[in-house]
UniProtKB/Swiss-Prot annotation:
SUPFAM superfamilies: Actin-like ATPase domain, Heat shock protein 70kD (HSP70), C-terminal subdomain, Heat shock protein 70kD (HSP70), peptide-binding domain. The keyword Repressor does not apply. The modification Phosphothreonine is found at T201. Keywords: ATP-binding, Chaperone, Nucleotide-binding, Phosphoprotein, Stress response. Acts as a chaperone. This is Chaperone protein DnaK.
Length: 642
């Protein structure tokens, strides 16, 4: 059985970890970084870039570079959040899919579901794990914000499937962080508050870590959060400030210039990071735009105090869910023994200060906020694989679940913060005499009014025998699995007739959609490999042309005019081949040049050996090695290519 990898699929960055023996280890990506930007770009040449490569070219390709896609996953286009919070904040097109979901589109008009885009990030994680382990990887534990609803969890599983991964478990991010902390912690019973402020979402979970018969039991007592509060909002606040200041100075509004906007966005993110250790920073963007008077440069000094004033309301917004989580757990602030900070945004001094003020204790600094979640996911993978045996994890459902009953009321079957997996049943009846069918409308949320909650789906239980209203007994059962995904059934107790569905969002992706996206992803993987191989062949050819011409020049009169002409002709033919897309033609012309150059090289080395006199025997070995000079040059090009 292969490894079950742990993936923190973040809004801004993602992280990968595996179990290495008894400990979880974060794996570096191909670029040597421990986190990967959750950015996917589609280039004009048809190449798909993921991670740092995609982020680097965002300024010149804003329409086709997709970031913060996690904020769209599992959401409807008409959601207030999508219309007000997301569409206005991203340079790429957010469109309405046929099923009502929020999708994205490239400038060429290619439409994609958010899980399809997220799958590209997961594919990179999968490839990184396979390169490290030297074996195929097919299973993963993927984390989601604790406050993700059923649709968002299902969409995350879909993304895994499209990427070629069987998602063995969806685990809440704060729970994963507590797992990472709890497994290393041997300090007896603790009540831990996990404050998780990431790139796009905020979660707070109150978690009890205790020793039960030698096992580390990690039980989530309550969770709360805000799926529209994160580091991206901090970036945006600073970006808008910079744009407003520039407008005051120059009278030009950069909001309508996508290229300039992307540059300011990146500068704002960089300045935000710099203002954690430093008291002030300069944002300097030369040639940001131009008007009739010439080019304009943006140069603005930002102090930490100014930045804090811009985002203080965002930090304060995170404290209300903290209060609710404590109330739901039935605890006071003094009951909390440890506070863990998770998510890159918690590096901000103001965040640390406000969290300390709220809980009345210093947050722990020994947990890596970027990596703890992935480490926890890997540990959960180890538990599922049977490699980690002394850990028991008890998570909760973040939102109440129920059905719509007479008068448009939501009747809750499972209250929020119920430990999962769980199963609850309740008997309902008909509202009319001789009612032949009932519609079960499944809801998620905390409001009394059914229409104010999230609709997860509907299904009908038909063929109810005629009877006066209130007589038939319809048993509705809600069953939540360990991933927090819901299965609902309705049964007529008189006839035994039953109807059930696994709840997806009322839109969501069908199995056919997912299968098509899996095939697209596999086709892209093949196309990506072909593109990579073509680039490698071109680089090899370019390098050989360069080294051949250089050698001819250095050998001078030792090479005849006919030989020079033959080499030059072979170089020109190879150059022509590299301008095309035929890898085999490039390789054939490369071989032809190597063969043309080989006799000249041998003759030159033989002359060198003769000149060496008595040391000829020793020197003769070196020319043999020198025959591999082309290979050594190839490796230099490989480095460049990376």
């Amino acid at each position: 059985m292969g490894k079950i990898i742990g993936i923190d699929l973040g809004t801004t960055n993602s992280c990968l970890a595996i179990m290495d023996g008894k400990t979880a280890k974060v794996i570096e990506n191909a670029e040597g970084h421990r986190t990967t930007p959750s950015v996917v770009a589609y280039t004009d040449s048809g190449e798909i870039l993921v991670g740092q490569a995609a982020k680097r070219q965002a300024v010149t390709n804003p329409d086709n570079t997709f970031f913060a896609i996690k904020r769209l996953i599992g959401r409807k286009y008409d959601d207030k959040a999508v219309q007000e919070d997301i569409k206005k904040k991203v340079p790429y097109a957010v469109i309405k899919a046929d099923n009502g979901d929020a999708w994205v589109a490239t400038k060429e008009g290619k439409k994609m579901a958010p899980p399809q885009v997220s799958a590209e990030v997961l594919r990179k994680m999968k490839k990184t794990a396979e390169d490290y382990l030297g074996e195929p990887v097919t299973e993963a534990v993927i984390t989601v914000p604790a406050y993700f609803n059923d649709s968002q969890r299902q969409a995350t599983k879909d993304a895994g499937k499209i990427a070629g991964l069987e998602v063995k478990r969806i685990i809440n991010e704060p729970t994963a962080a507590a797992l990472a902390y709890g497994v290393d912690s041997k300090k007896g019973e603790q009540t831990v508050a996990v404050y998780d402020l990431g790139g796009g979402t905020f979660d707070i979970s109150i978690i009890e870590i205790s020793d039960v018969d030698g096992d580390n039991q990690i039980e989530v007592l309550s969770t709360n959060g805000d799926t529209f509060l994160g580091g991206e909002d901090f970036d945006l606040a600073l970006m808008n400030y910079l744009i407003d200041e520039f407008k005051k100075e120059q009278g030009i509004d950069l909001h309508n210039d996508k290229l300039a906007l992307q540059r300011v966005r990146e500068a704002a993110e960089k300045a935000k990071v710099e203002l954690s250790p430093a008291q002030q920073t300069d944002v300097n963007l030369p040639y940001i735009t131009a008007d009739a008077t010439g080019p304009k440069h943006l140069n603005i000094k930002v102090t930490r105090a100014k930045f804090e004033s811009l985002v203080s309301d965002l930090v304060m917004r995170s404290l209300e869910p903290c209060k609710k989580a404590l109330e739901d757990a039935g605890l006071s602030k003094s009951d909390i023994t440890e506070v863990l900070l998770v998510g890159g945004q918690t590096r901000m001094p103001l965040v640390q200060e406000k969290v300390k003020e709220f809980f009345g204790k210093e947050p722990r600094k020994d947990v890596n906020p970027d990596e703890a979640v992935a480490v926890g996911a890997a540990i959960q993978g180890g538990v599922l694989a049977g490699d980690v045996k002394d850990v028991l994890l008890l998570d909760v459902t973040p939102l109440s679940l129920g059905i719509e009953t007479m008068g448009g009321v939501m009747t809750k079957l499972i209250e929020r913060n119920t430990t999962i997996p769980t199963k609850k049943s309740q008997v309902f009846s008909t509202a009319e005499d001789n009612q032949p069918a009932v519609t079960i409308h499944v809801l998620q949320g905390e409001r009394e009014m059914a229409s104010a909650n999230k609709s997860l789906g509907r299904f009908d239980l038909a063929d109810i025998p005629p009877a006066p209203r209130g007589m038939p007994q319809i048993e509705v059962t809600f069953d939540i699995d360990a991933n927090g995904i819901l299965n609902v059934s309705a049964k007529d107790k008189a006839t035994g007739k039953e109807q059930n569905i696994v709840i997806k969002s009322s839109s969501g992706l069908s199995e056919e959609d997912i299968e098509k996206m899996v095939q697209d992803a596999e086709a892209n993987a093949e196309a990506d490999k072909k593109f990579h191989d073509l680039v490698t062949a071109r680089n090899t050819a370019d390098n050989l042309i360069h080294s051949s011409r250089k050698a001819i020049q250095e050998l001078g009169d030792k090479v005849t005019a006919a030989e020079k002409e033959k080499i030059e002709e072979a170089c020109k033919e190879l150059e022509a081949a590299t301008k095309g897309d035929d890898k085999q033609a490039i390789e054939a012309k490369t071989k032809a040049l190597e063969e043309a150059f080989a006799p000249i090289a041998q003759k030159a080395y033989a002359e060198q050996a003769q000149a060496a006199g008595a040391q000829g025997g020793a020197k003769a070995e070196e020319p043999k090695k020198e025959e591999d000079v082309v290979d050594a040059d190839f490796e230099d090009v490989e480095d460049d290519k990376k």
